């Protein structure tokens, strides 16, 4: 796997192409958007400081977009994960958002994207991961933990298509202005990571999952400023529950606020909070909230320091994850990110550490 990562990075750096973003609505009419790609690799060392155990996790993502007729694009994305060691912590909320079973190749994104009405309305049909579109506000990306990538009330109560799984679905977006985004998605109720199952759409057997959100984002005055984001999202799921041998419907919501606070010289300060709740007899997670304090541009090269507090409530447990992390860019393509987590799971405490290197092309 290590040689695969190096070979992919080497091949990408030796080939020039304009990367306009596979899911950018503005790219559909631009001449340079006829063909574009992206490639990213993450390698992470992990250490359970309470037990002394160590681990190593790796993730490789690649995407490709090909312009077709006006406003239409064919999109594809693959994912590879490699973890030669066992998991080092038994926690409810995973401390690393790249932990996944070993699989050299997953097709996680494949379908047709079509834009209408001057790119204000977008429709995608095909394979897709929910965390491409939801739970991905700017400050959520500061954390290395899994809960900020998908709230536990959604991730733990459904077999949903978030990393590393995918599902067949219909995704619709509407952007009446650059600040407002309304989106909703209907997925197959069971997500998979193998090609022979991923393209299934079986509402009678697997049920369905619907996610949606309405958000308003106000960009900062400069490119490196924190942006303000206000979001409300919902989920509905109807699936077969093994414990009761019957179909079960659940509904829930989540809300996120990300707010710049002040700027001291070049350093920006911001705060964020998310809350979620699940109704109708959730099987695993009932409620969740988090809070984040962050400061960016701490050095002349950049650098963002974040303190993140996650609190999750389960039917048979409760857990708090406190994370301190610092993401430091090293040139144009590399980012170094150490992180320390303190977990308290129904009174059981442990310390976990990570050192992550990300390469993005």
Residue ranges and their predicted role:
Residues 62, 110, 170, 212-214, ...:
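Membrane-embedded beta-strands of outer-membrane beta-barrel proteins
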Residues 217-314:
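Detector for outer-membrane/organellar transmembrane beta-barrel domains
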Residues 35, 70-74, 119-123, 179-184, ...:
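Repeated loop/turn-to-beta-strand initiation elements of outer-membrane beta-barrel proteins
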Residues 349-361:
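Outer-membrane beta-barrel "beta-signal"
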Residues 61, 65-189, 283-290, 294-297, ...:
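Outer membrane beta-barrel
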Residues 173-240:
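Loop-centered beta-sheet repeat module
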Residues 37-45, 74-80, 123-129, 184-188, ...:
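Transmembrane beta-barrel strands of outer-membrane/channel proteins
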């Amino acid at each position: 796997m290590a040689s695969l990562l190096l070979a992919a990075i080497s091949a990408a750096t030796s080939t020039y192409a304009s990367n306009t973003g596979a899911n950018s609505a503005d790219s559909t009419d631009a001449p340079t958007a006829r063909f574009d790609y992206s490639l990213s690799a993450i390698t992470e060392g992990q250490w359970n400081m309470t037990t002394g155990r160590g681990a190593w996790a790796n993730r490789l993502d690649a995407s490709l977009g090909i312009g077709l007729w006006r406003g239409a694009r064919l999109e594809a994305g693959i994912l590879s994960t490699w973890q030669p060691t066992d998991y080092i912590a038994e926690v409810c909320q995973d401390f690393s958002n790249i932990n996944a079973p070993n699989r050299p190749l997953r097709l996680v994104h494949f379908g047709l994207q079509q834009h209408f009405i001057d790119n204000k309305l977008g429709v995608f049909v095909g394979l897709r991961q929910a965390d491409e579109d939801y739970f991905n506000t700017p400050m959520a990306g500061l954390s290395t933990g899994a809960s900020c990538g998908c709230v536990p009330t959604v991730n733990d109560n459904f077999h949903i298509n978030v990393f590393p799984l995918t599902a067949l679905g219909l995704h619709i977006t509407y952007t009446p202005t650059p600040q407002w985004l309304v989106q909703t998605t209907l997925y197959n109720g069971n997500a998979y990571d193998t090609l022979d199952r991923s393209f299934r759409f079986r509402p009678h057997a697997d049920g369905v999952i619907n996610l949606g959100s309405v958000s308003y984002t106000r960009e900062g005055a400069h490119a490196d400023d924190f942006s303000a984001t206000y979001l409300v999202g919902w989920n509905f799921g109807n699936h077969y529950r093994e414990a009761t041998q019957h179909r079960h419907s659940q509904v829930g919501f989540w809300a996120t606020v990300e707010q710049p606070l002040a700027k001291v010289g070049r350093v920006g300060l911001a705060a964020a909070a998310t809350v979620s709740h699940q109704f109708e007899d959730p099987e695993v997670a009932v409620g969740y909230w988090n809070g984040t304090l962050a400061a960016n541009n701490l050095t002349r090269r950049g650098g963002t320091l974040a303190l993140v507090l996650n609190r999750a409530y389960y039917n048979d447990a409760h857990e708090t994850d406190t994370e301190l992390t610092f993401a430091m860019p090293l040139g144009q393509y590399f980012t170094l990110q150490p992180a320390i987590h303190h977990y308290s799971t129904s009174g059981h405490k442990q310390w976990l550490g990570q050192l992550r290197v990300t390469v993005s092309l």
